[in-house]
Structures are given as C-alpha cells and as structure tokens.
Amino acid sequence: MNQEAASNLGLDLKLNISPSLDSSLLTESSSSSLCSEEAEGGGGEAKSMVVVGCPNCIMYIITSLENDPRCPRCNSHVLLDFLTGNHSKKSTS
C-alpha cells in the first residue's frame, strides 16, 4: 500500500524516531552500573541456576540450589529437579 492510498484510509504512516544517543553517555552509564554492582558485592562468581518444580503449586522455579531453596509461592522445601532427576525433599514449613 502506498502512502497516498494510506492517507485516503486515514492512516498515519509517519514514523518519529528519536535522535540516537551519544556513545560516550552509554559507555559512562554502563561503567557506573558495573561499579555499583561491585560495591554491592555483585562482583563475585555467578551462581549456577537450576530449574525445579514445586509439586504443591505445580509451578517451575529458577533458583540456586546452594542456599535453602524454597517455593516462592507456598514456601515449601519440596522441589523437584526434573532435568537431572535429583529431588530436594525436605519437610514443608
């Protein structure tokens, strides 16, 4: 459809694009965010994440198994790691 036909239909096909950002501003903001992460203790190694399932809520959760994993919805300790077959069965609180 050409622009003349579109204007006959009452459609506005003009695209307003904002001017591009200065690349120096992008570099400055990304380096400052890295500094703030390091100040907050985020500069350490990344924790490995696993996908587990809660049989109570019938919901999947992405979590780290290093700490005490719980379902965010029902606070249950019973989480099933369905990819590797490991079960983290503990008493429900």
Curated annotation (Swiss-Prot):
The keyword Signal appears for this protein: no
A family per Pfam = Zn-ribbon_GIR1
UniProt region (Disordered), positions on chain = 23-46
Composition-biased stretches, type Low complexity, lie in 23-36
What disulfide bonds does the UniProt entry report for this chain? Answer: none
Q: Which residue spans adopt a coiled-coil conformation according to this UniProt entry?
A: none
Gene Ontology process terms (BP): ethylene-activated signaling pathway; regulation of reactive oxygen species metabolic process; response to salt stress
Top-level division of the source organism's lineage: Eukaryota
Its activity is regulated as follows:
Triggered by EIN3.
Q: What happens when the gene is disrupted?
A: Increased sensitivity to salt.
What are the protein's UniProt keywords? Ethylene signaling pathway, Stress response
Q: Does the keyword Isomerase apply?
A: no
* Known function: Involved in ethylene-dependent salt stress responses by reducing reactive oxygen species (ROS) accumulation.
Concerning PANTHER family, the annotation shows: PROTEIN SALT-INDUCED AND EIN3_EIL1-DEPENDENT 1, PUTATIVE-RELATED
Instruction: Output this protein's name.
Output: Protein salt-induced and EIN3/EIL1-dependent 1
This chain's source organism reads Arabidopsis thaliana (Mouse-ear cress)
